[in-house]
Amino acid sequence: MSTVKGQTRRERPRGARPHGLTKQKRQEIKEAFDLFDTDNSGTIDAKELNVAMRALGFEMTEEQINQMIADVDKDGSGSIDYEEFEHMMTAKIGERDSKEELTKAFSIIDQDKNGKISDVDIQRIAKELGENFTYQEIQEMVQEADRNGDGEIDFDEFIRMMRRTGYGY
């Protein structure tokens, strides 16, 4: 942390990426912005944004596109500049990456690949991680996450649980 004019700010570790994006990903975002700013206005409107989002791998409805613009359009112009676009894309990429990570984690824990995490799955992964939970503690974990009462944790229940604990997106 450092202090500038009485304000405290967190220092980014040397070599850390701003916004958590790699230089390559930032370049892709800049290229997408430039490519889809077809009128060279320095801004992207809803139509241009829809094309840019598709190029970056996001399928979105017109309503979602309009909401995205409304969320970041500070001046109410109906379009977004590069800084707003980069900020928005950083958030979208973070959401996608988090979901991908949670999907991988679920797959690792769901050893028998039946689409559900059982008490046996939790016991096995806990043992692999060197955690010693009692059977009762494992049952409580399952019950806490098990919304539909089937005694196991499906993917949606897993996501919900991870969001509540701060590990998810």
UniProtKB/Swiss-Prot annotation:
Residues annotated as binding Ca(2+) 2 are: D73, D75, S77, S79, E84
Q: Where does Ca(2+) 3 bind?
A: D110, D112, N114, K116, D121
Q: Where is the composition biased (Basic residues)?
A: 15-24
Record's function text: Potential calcium sensor.
Region (Disordered) residue spans: 1-26
Q: Which InterPro entries match?
A: CALM/Myosin/TropC-like, EF-hand-dom_pair, EF_Hand_1_Ca_BS, EF_hand_dom
Sorted alphabetically, the Gene Ontology BP terms of this entry are:
microtubule cytoskeleton organization
Does this UniProt record's set of keywords contain Repeat?
yes
Q: Give me the residues that bind Ca(2+) 4, please.
A: D146, N148, D150, E152, E157
Source organism (scientific name): Oryza sativa subsp. japonica (Rice)
Output a single Gene Ontology CC term carried by this record.
Answer: nucleus
Residues engaged in binding Ca(2+) 1:
D37, D39, S41, T43, E48
What are the residue boundaries of the EF-hand domain, all occurrences included? 24-59, 60-95, 97-132, 133-168
User: What Gene3D superfamilies does the record point to?
Assistant: EF-hand
Specify the protein name.
Answer: Probable calcium-binding protein CML13
Keyword list (alphabetical) reads: Calcium, Metal-binding, Repeat
